[in-house]
Structures are given as structure tokens and as C-alpha cells.
From Swiss-Prot:
Main location: periplasm
Protein name per UniProt: Tol-Pal system protein TolB
One GO cellular component, as annotated: periplasmic space
Pfam families: PD40, TolB_N
Gene behind the chain: tolB
Amino acid sequence: MKFSAYLTTLFIVLFSLFIQTVQAESEVRIVIDEGVDSARPIAIIPFKWNGSDSMPIDVADIISADLRNSGKFNPIAVSKMPQKPTSASEVISDVWSSLGIDAVVVGQVTPNEKGYSIAYQLVDTIGASGNSGEVLSQNQYAVPKNAIRLGAHTISDEVFEKLTAIRGAFRTKIAYVVQKNGGSKPYQVRIADYDGHNQFIVYSSSQPLMSPAWSPDGSKLAYVSFENRKSQLIVHDLQSGARRVIAAFPGHNGAPAFSPDGSKIAFASSKDGVLNIYVMNLGNGTISQLTSGAGNNTEPSWSPDGQSIIFTSDRAGGPQIYQMDVVGNGVSLVSAGRGYSGKISADGSILVMIYGDNIVKKDLATGVTEMLSSTFLDESPSISPNGIMIIYSSTQGLGKVLQLVSADGRFKARLPSSDGQIKFPAWSPYLNKN
């Protein structure tokens, strides 16, 4: 399949995924709090516009923002660019390498009847590939008129992977809960691009909604609903809009987490008087209890291989993170101290958690920990599928906002909303095949 056809197909799939949703009144937007001066410099040249009117969206600006958000790159400001080439043949390598910039992205956007044709080239300016001026990566593809941002994120993914050997995650989504300032249904589960654009309402309710969690194929969300004045777990099909209640036991039902193969959901329930971890087989509805005892056990999260579950427990007097196998045996302490809301990266290398009031990363091989945030009352960390970025909620003033931090701590930003408090962010899996 040609890449242009692939990208068009991808757009149709992503659009149909959210076809049952309603576009939200306002969108979250990234506000940079801390930059990446120590990251790898790169130049994203403003793309040439081959239309008679003005370019609807600055493609180069989106690519620059994506690469900056990863914490791996520090795009040079347009005002400091020594030249503004539009093709690889126009790139003068020496003027870029003298600035310490070893890679330059150039491109063009051409409007057509169906949308836009976007072309780019990634140029090596120091000869790391063998020849200075060599094109490391290039592509040309077509996008519908309302998917130009998807085209830009696609370029970002390709450039990021070429330069880091790590798959890009700029075409992923985030789900979260918004509590609006007024209205008959102020609680909403929403989905947006990872950077806050193209926001949609998945479901609205007059009662609280909590803890959205993605299925591994990105087709469903599980979340907590307090409709009918009781907590219940819902699985929501994002394409059809169908909602299925999977747990409505007496007491609290919360913290759903899909297994890596999508066949099971781990959750916490106090149906027997004490909060414990359970696993439900989604095929036949059978439930297994994994924890027991006097302490409260909650916030289950699966290991990437699906062979173990980490969870938060106060069995020792305060919240700590433990790990057990999928039948509840072999319980071990993962992180001592006041730690909770643990998540393991997709490659199994790091644990991200709340420690005290902040986001902390723990290297699971070395045991070394690093504080990534300095915000207030941090909650609900979620890791991008490539392990490069972390999204979480924090308190700002009297409300809750989303925060983005790169896994190395270099880049920090806020995603505030203008129409309510934002909580419980959940990063999607990859939604495209490559």
C-alpha cells in the first residue's frame, strides 16, 4: 500500500473510532513551563506553502512542538535559522553544523481538491550517515483537509524514530475526565490528541466519572461511573458507543485496568467490606479475588508481559506499591515509603508513581529513583506507549489541570482547560500499525 493511501486509511480509522462522540466546547492547549536547552538541537524549517491563500496550520510548528515535548530535542527558533531551505538540495550543511545542528527537516505543503499533499526530507548535516547533506528519511503523502495535524504528527513520528531508534508516539490519544463549571451533565469523559487538540466528548453524566483506562487495541475505554447513585465499572465501545456494566457490586468499584491481551480487567472493589483487587474474565464474566487481609488494596496495573500486577496497599500502615502474580501469589514490595498510583513502562524498564505529592521515576534494574515533577498534589500518572512522556494531573490554584513531563525530566508543560477541571488522564496505546 502506498503511504498516501495508508495515511488516508489511518485517518478514516481514527475518525470512525470517535464518530459517536460530540466535539467539546473548548480544548486543552500545551503551555510550556520548562524547556529543553540541554536536549539535542534540531532545525525544523518552515514548510513551503504552495497555495494561493495562507497555510491553514503551521506544519513545521507542530513537528517542532512534538519533538520538544519528547525532551529529546531542542528545535532552534525560526528567528535564529541561518537559512530557510525548502528542499534537501538547498540545505547548506556547514552553516548548520557550525551551530551544532546535525539534522534539518525541510518540506512543502500543497493543497488539492481532497486536502493536502505533504512532503518532507530529513537531512544529515554532519555526515554521521557517511555523507554530509544525505537525506536520512523522506516521504510524501496525502491527508484530508481536516487531518493536516495528523500528517504533521506522522512526520514527527518518522523523524523521531529515525534519529532515536525509538518509535514515535505523537499520533496517540489521551483520555481524561472533565468536571465542567455548571450544566446538567458536568462530568465528561473526553478524548483528545496527545497534545490536547481535536478533543471529543465520549460520555457525559450528571454524576461523577472516574479513572478511564484504554483497551490494548484502543477500541474501548473502561471507566468508573456513579450513575444510579452507586459506583459501577463501564466498558465503553468507542466506535459503536455501546456501554456495558461489568461490575456494580455493593460498596466501591474502581481503578479498572485492561490486561495486555485485552481479555481481562483488573479492578478494586469493596464488595466484601474491604477494598481488594479482583480480575474479571471479559469473555465469561468470571471473577477471581487476588488480595485479602485487613489492608486496603487498590490501583492495579499490569506488567507489560501480563504475568504480574502491581498495586497500592496500606497493609503496612501507609500506601506502598507491591507486585504479585496474576493469581495473587508471590507478593513483594516494589517501592517502600509513601508510594502509590504505580505504572510500569511498556518496555518494563521503569516504574512511574506518586511518591509523597510528586511524580517519581524508578529504574527497575538499578533501583535508582528520580523526581520528575515539582507541581502540587500530583495524581494519576500515565506513560506514553514508547515510555518517553508522562501525563498526569495536578492542582493549580483551585482546580485540576493536566501536566506533561518527559521521562528524562527535561521538558515540562501544562495542558489547562478553559471550561472545567481535568482529572484522571490515560495515555492510549499506539493507534496505528507503524
